[in-house]
Regions:
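A short, well-structured edge-of-sheet supersecondary motif
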Residues: 1-14, 25, 53, 206-207
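Short helix- or helix-capping micro-motifs
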Residues: 43-63
């Protein structure tokens, strides 16, 4: 933490910052051989990779696809709810428990929990979110090649909308991580590198 103001140990809703945390736990499952990025998941023709990259064709909410997989970048809570089901089936434990065992406990994120949807229901303190940010910067829980893949745009030609910021063509997204690319306006700093990765949430959270 470079600078802080206020109570950094107070627990706040993470909103969609829940998504990259759950995505990272899915990559742990991939590394352990429990899930493959190319396993079928969600709508017909979609895979775990499509769900992580918001390329499955699912809408924001609801399980009726609005596009074929790999045609549009459609930001989808539903896709991450389905990803949670995939994790539970593959690991044999609830998604909240899986994330706790593979992410929160190893990183020392003592205040963090996901008491509801794996798309948006996470809670944690700012200090704990900073621990996850440090993991993204220098991965310890996911191997180097897989972490590097997560930070590369999947289906890079897809256009799509970043909620609250507009439509971009292309709209790069990695495996659960938004990639800055050439998007303007954007929630990251104006001079941020196009390779910047992270996520923001409606509650005012970001990582």
């Amino acid at each position: 933490v470079v600078y802080s103001h206020g109570d950094v140990d107070r627990v706040f809703p993470l909103a969609s910052v829940t998504k990259p945390i759950v995505a990272w736990s899915a990559l742990v499952a991939v590394e352990r051989g429990l899930i493959s990025l190319d396993d079928p998941a969600g709508p017909e023709g979609a895979t775990v990779r499509h769900l992580l990259a918001h390329a499955s064709g699912l809408p924001f909410e609801g399980r009726r696809p609005v596009a074929a997989p790999e045609k549009r970048r459609i930001y989808s809570n539903e896709g991450f709810d389905i990803l949670g089901e995939v994790i539970e089936t593959a690991t044999g434990v609830g998604v909240a428990q899986w994330v706790r065992e593979t992410i929160f406990e190893p990183l020392g994120m003592a205040t963090a929990d996901i008491p509801g949807s794996p798309a948006h229901a996470g809670v944690a303190s700012a200090s704990d979110v900073s621990l996850f940010g440090a993991e993204l910067a220098r991965p310890t829980l996911v191997n180097g090649p897989l972490a590097a893949l997560a930070a590369l745009s999947q289906f890079p030609a897809l256009a799509g909308v970043v909620p609250g910021y507009g439509r971009f063509n292309p709209c790069p997204w990695g495996l659960g991580l938004e990639i800055r690319g050439e998007k303007t306006p954007h929630w990251t700093a104006p001079d941020a590198s196009p390779r910047t990765i992270g996520h923001f949430g409606q509650s005012g959270s970001f990582v």
